[in-house]
Each structure stands twice: as structure tokens, then as C-alpha cells.
Amino acid sequence: MKHLKLGLVQTGDPLKLCTDQYNAFCDAMKDVLGVELIQSEWEINGAEDAERIATAFEARAVDLTVLMCCSLVGDGRVIQPFIRSHQEVVVWCLPEPTREGPLLLNSMTCANLYTSSATQMSRETGGKRAKWIYGLVEDPLMMPRLLSSIRAIRARKSMQGATLVQVGKTAEGFINLGFDAEAIHDKSGVNVVFCSLEEIFRDMNAVSDADATALAGTIAC
């Protein structure tokens, strides 16, 4: 199992209204096998903070950054350094009281601003976008949605440097099965090579029965 580094950073929370959820998230991550939680030393209160934190996370080889929207801070530039980095980004939006309690902190507005900015940047970042999650840590869908991203990133890390072989051609007309091998390599580090059936049969026939039997004995099923 590949080790994964998860960075956690929050926007400014001067009234400490998000402290309980922040701590609950940290506690929940302790139970996720193979994940190292890296907490930012600073909150985000503007684009300069975001740049500094994204750089610090990049220096520590963070794979996934969770940006906790405690309040509406800055503008769309806040998310840009994270999107330009090698980190994947999840924007976490928290529910707020609708009938009573403290003044709204515009968490959803903040999340919408950041994810929209990331989407606008997708052309210059090879299609990279930010994923959003909504809810409290104890909600039934919040953590599973995040964990699906963690599993996907871990799978991609495990596949880096691997070689996939497509044997034979894609049947004519199945244009939906076409892909760009170079783009796959650039995005995931996976090499794709193509081999015809004729090449497979030729190489099979060139192997002696003794060598084939010896090789079969080394393959674990």
C-alpha cells in the first residue's frame, strides 16, 4: 500500500467556530491506514498565505490538500497555487445554521468561489480541477466521499512507472474507447504500449515448452 500525505489547511476562523470540526477531522484521519496528516502552520487569510502554504505543502510532497472553508476569505486567487502544484485539491464546505446561532460565515460561497476558479484554470493545468465535499465529519456521506479520493490517488501512485499493454486493435467504430497514450503518461506516469496479436503469437511460438513450464511455475495466482 502506497503511503499518502494529506495536507489540511483552513481559511481564517477568528471566532473558532470550526475548531470542533477541524479536530474531528484530524481524529478521523488517525483511523485511515497509510495516510500521514500534515497540518498547516498558518490559516489562509489571503492569496499570499495560500501561496506560502501551497509551497510548504509542495516541499513536503503532499499528495492531497483539503482546504477547509471556515469563512469567505480572499478571492479566486486563493486556490490557484494549490491547483498549479502537484497536489490534488479537495475543498471542504461546512453546513451553517439557518434558524439560530452565530452569523453565517459564507462557507458555501467560499467553496463555490474556489472551485469555480479552479475550473477556469483547468485549461492551463491539463484538466485538473478541485473536488468539493460538503458536510460535518460525522455525516454519513462526508468522509466516504473524501476516502474515495484518497483511494484514487493512492491507486495512481501505485501505478506510476507501470506499463500497460493493449493487445490488438480497437474495433472500428468504437471511437469512445480511443485514448491518448502520451496524455496518460503525462498525467499518471503510466506507460502504454501497443502489441498486435501476430506479435503475441510469434513470441509465444518462439518459447520452448520447457521455458514456458518453468515460467508458469514462478507465477503466483
Predicted ranges, named:
Residues M1-C221:
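An N-terminal assembly and electron-transfer interface module characteristic of large anaerobic redox
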